C-alpha cells in the first residue's frame, strides 16, 4: 500500500474514537495534516505558479518581490510552536482548513491545495499591501508598534511579518470571506450586508430582489433584508419570501460556502401572521433556506405588560409610512394617531400575536427578536425620522440601510490566547491569568486587519457607498474557555467582572486605535462623523448610563478630547457575532456563549465528526473518565462529587437563561453594535408559552438590542453516541510510527513525543 493509503486507513480507524480518546483525536488530526501536506504547495515559487493566476496582480507582485523572505517566514512557521499547536487541535479543525478555507486545487491534473503556511501568507500579504498603500494605516501601525510594544517597523517586509504572526498564531481570526478570498482577484471580503429594498410595486420588488439582492448573494456573504415595506396589489408576502428563498437555494447549489438571507418585518405590519407562518414545519410551501426576524417597538411590550388582552392594530405600510421611520415616543404618537383615524387594516389581541411569535420560535428557532428602541437609542447617530428596523443575517450588526447597502467587515479575537500561565494550556490549574495587554495588542491588530479589508472592492455600487462609514465588527470566541481555565463558572461573580472588563478594554482599544489613524496617520474621519455622537464626546457606554470600571476615566477623557479634535476613522467597533465557522479552526468555544456541550458532533454531506470539548476533556481525571463517558459529558447528570469537580464545565442549557440575558446586559454598554444572543432552553422551559414570553419581556426591560438571535431547545432524550470505546493499541502504535516521519522534518528543539498541549476546544455566512 502507498503511504497515502496507510495514513488514510489510520485516520479512519482513529477518528471513530476521537470523541473520548484525546490522544486518538490529536493523532488523527496530525495524520490528516501530514496527508494533506503531500498534496499541498511547498515553496512560494510553486505556490505562485499554481495559484498566481487567481491572485490580484498587485498581491502577486508583492509576493514575487519578497519571495525569498516569505519562504523563510513560512519555513520558520512550520517549525514553530504556533504551527505545532494548530496541527494538534484534532481531526475536525484539520478537516475544516482544507474543506472550507484554503484555496483548493485549480485542476484535477495538478491537484495541489494551498498549504496552511501559504494560506496565512496570502492573507498577510493582502493586509500588508493595503496597509502600505494606505498611508494613514501604515503610519499609525508604525507609531503604535513603537510606542506601545517597543517594536520598530521600517520595511514593508516587517509589516508583512506583523500581520503574519498575528494571523498565523490565531490570536486574531479573520472572517470567513477574508480567509477564503483575501488577495484573490474579484472577490468580496465583507461579511455582512443589509438592504431595505423598495417593495411597493411588482416592478420595484423584482428589481430589488434580482438587481440588489442577487449580486450580494453571489459575493458569498450573508444579507439582512427589510421587508416591512412590502405592500401592493393584495399580494401575499409569502410569495416575496419564496422569491428570496429560491435565490438562496440557487446560490447554495453545489457551493462550498453556503449563504443565506434574514428577512425582517415590524410587528405592526398587516401580514405579520403570514410572515410568521412562512417557515412553520406544517406549512407545505415553507421557506426552509431563509431566516426571519421581527422588529418590535417598545409600545408593543409596554401595552402587553399593561394588558395582554388589549388590542394591537395592524397597518398596510402604504397607509402608515411614518411608522417605519420613527421609534420611541414619536412612534407611539404616530401609532395612536393612525389608530384614532382608523387607518388600520385589522386588530388582534396582544396575547394572540405574542403567542403566534412564540409558537414560531419554538417550532423553528426563530424569528430573531430585535428591539426597535434599543437599536436606535444606542446608535452612533440620532436616527429619529430614519429609524433602524432590521439587522443582518445573525442579528449582531446595527446599521441604517435606507439610502444604500449597509456593509460590515468582521474579525474576532481568540480570547484564550490572551491567557498567561506557566501551566496553560497543558492543564486547567486555576492559576491562569488574563493578559489585558495581549488583548489590547489583538484588538489593535484587528483594527488594522479590518481596515485593510475595507479597502477591497464591493460587489455593488450601493455597497461601496456603505463602506464609507467604515463599520467594523470586532468579536471574540473562547470566552467560556477563559473562564474555566481560570477556575470560574460562566455565571460566577468573578467571571462577570472579567467579562465586563474584557469588552470595556476591547471597545476602548478599538476606538483609540481608530482615532489614532486620524490623529497620527492623518486619515480622514468616516463619512458622517460630524453627525455622530462621538463627535460630541459621547461614547457608547454613556448612552447606557454605565460607568467604565477598568480603563481610568482620565484615559477616556483624553480619548474624548482627541476624537473631538481629530475625529475617528471608523463608525462602529464591537459586534459579537456567532463564530461557528472560525472557532472550529482553533477548537475553542463559539463566540461569547457558554459551552454548547462537552460532546457533540459536526455533520456534513460527507461524514460525521465527533467534536469533544477539549478544554473539558484534558481536565478529566483518569479515574473519572468512565463516569464522564457514561453521562455523555453532561456534568449536571453526574454524581455530586464528580459534578462538583467539573462544575466549571456546565453547558449553556444548565445555566439560567435569565442570568445569561442579564450578563449580556452587563457587557452591552461596550458592544456598540449588538450581540447574537442565543437562548438555550430545555423542553421543560417551552412546555408553555409563558416562559419564553417572560424572557422576551426581560430582554426588553434590560434594554437589549438583540433580545433573541436564535432559540435552541435541548431535547430530554438523546441518541446514543456511537463510537469505539477502546481503540486497538496497535492502531495508535502504527500511527505514531507514521508520525515519526513528521517529527524528523522538524528541528530538534521542536520534536516532541507528547501531543500538542494547545488542544482546546452551521452556518458560516457571517464568520
Swiss-Prot record:
- Which residues participate in substrate binding? 176, 191-192, 222, 392-396, 578-582
A molecular function (GO) held by this record is:
ribonucleoside-diphosphate reductase activity, thioredoxin disulfide as acceptor
Domain of life of the native organism: Viruses
Active site residues of this protein: 392 (proton acceptor), 394 (cysteine radical intermediate), 396 (proton acceptor)
Q: Does the keyword Transmembrane helix apply?
A: no
Question: E.C. number, please?
Answer: 1.17.4.1
Enzyme class label: oxidoreductase
- Important for electron transfer, annotated site positions: 709-710
Query: Which residues does the annotation list for site: Important for hydrogen atom transfer?
Result: 192, 408
Q: Which UniProt keywords apply?
A: ATP-binding, Disulfide bond, DNA replication, Early protein, Nucleotide-binding, Oxidoreductase
Q: What are the disulfide bonds?
A: 192-408
What's a GO biological-process term for it? DNA replication
Q: Name one Pfam family in it.
A: Ribonuc_red_lgN
Q: Which reaction does it catalyse?
A: a 2'-deoxyribonucleoside 5'-diphosphate + [thioredoxin]-disulfide + H2O = a ribonucleoside 5'-diphosphate + [thioredoxin]-dithiol
For the site labelled Interacts with thioredoxin/glutaredoxin, the residues are 763, 766
Cite the record's note on assembly: Heterotetramer composed of a homodimer of the large subunit (R1) and a homodimer of the small subunit (R2). Larger multisubunit protein complex are also active, composed of (R1)n(R2)n.
Main role?
Ribonucleoside-diphosphate reductase holoenzyme provides the precursors necessary for viral DNA synthesis. Allows virus growth in non-dividing cells, as well as reactivation from latency in infected hosts. Catalyzes the biosynthesis of deoxyribonucleotides from the corresponding ribonucleotides.
**Alphabetical list of NCBIfam families matching this protein:** NrdE_NrdA (TIGR02506)
The identity of this protein, by name, is: Ribonucleoside-diphosphate reductase large subunit
User: What organism is this sequence from?
Assistant: Saimiriine herpesvirus 2 (strain 11) (SaHV-2)
Encoding gene (name): RIR1
